[in-house]
């Protein structure tokens, strides 16, 4: 049992010895229904978490200040803000200072990672973050499946731990619609 995705693909659940386990849905930069102008905005991140999604965020550290933003740091936050949401965040460190900061100050409770187009990246929580379109592995995170998923590769996604998408609402709705 799973979710039908463009062309009738089975998606978003996998069988286990204890029944169907839904895939975790991670909002990419706080997006809900496609890329938007409020990406990485703290209020948008909170909205995503309150809506039941995990959230991938982009973190910069400049002059000991924590900032969210994709191409550059825009929105100031602090370590308490991250810790208050640590169970729902996937933190993409955008510069070496952010990576060093989290590695030294967080006791590995906040899940974080670094990559720049790498095919595979291991997060601090030992999940394999897979570049869009690359081969998936059991327990990995499929990034932006809306860009590459087709009927030929649909079975691969069932092995994943999670998907990270700009369309979490769509995937959630499809999952709910296909549940018994």
Q: Where do the model's predicted regions map?
A:
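Intrinsic disorder/low-complexity segments
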Residues: 6-8
């Amino acid at each position: 049992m799973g979710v039908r995705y463009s062309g009738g693909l089975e998606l978003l659940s996998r069988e286990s010895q204890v029944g169907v386990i839904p895939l975790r849905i991670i909002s990419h930069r706080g997006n809900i229904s496609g890329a938007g102008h409020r990406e990485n905005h703290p209020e948008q991140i909170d909205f995503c978490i309150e809506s039941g999604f995990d959230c991938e965020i982009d973190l910069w550290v400049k002059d000991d200040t924590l900032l969210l933003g994709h191409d550059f740091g825009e929105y100031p936050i602090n370590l308490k803000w991250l810790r208050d949401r640590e169970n729902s965040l996937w933190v993409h460190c955008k510069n070496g200072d952010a990576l060093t900061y989290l590695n030294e100050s967080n006791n590995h409770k906040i899940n974080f990672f670094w990559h720049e187009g790498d095919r595979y990246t291991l997060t601090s929580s030992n999940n394999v973050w897979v570049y869009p379109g690359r081969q998936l592995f059991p327990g990995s995170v499929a990034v932006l499946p809306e860009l590459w998923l087709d009927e030929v590769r649909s079975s691969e996604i069932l092995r994943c731990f999670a998907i990270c998408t700009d369309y979490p609402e769509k995937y959630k709705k499809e999952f709910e619609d296909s549940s018994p």
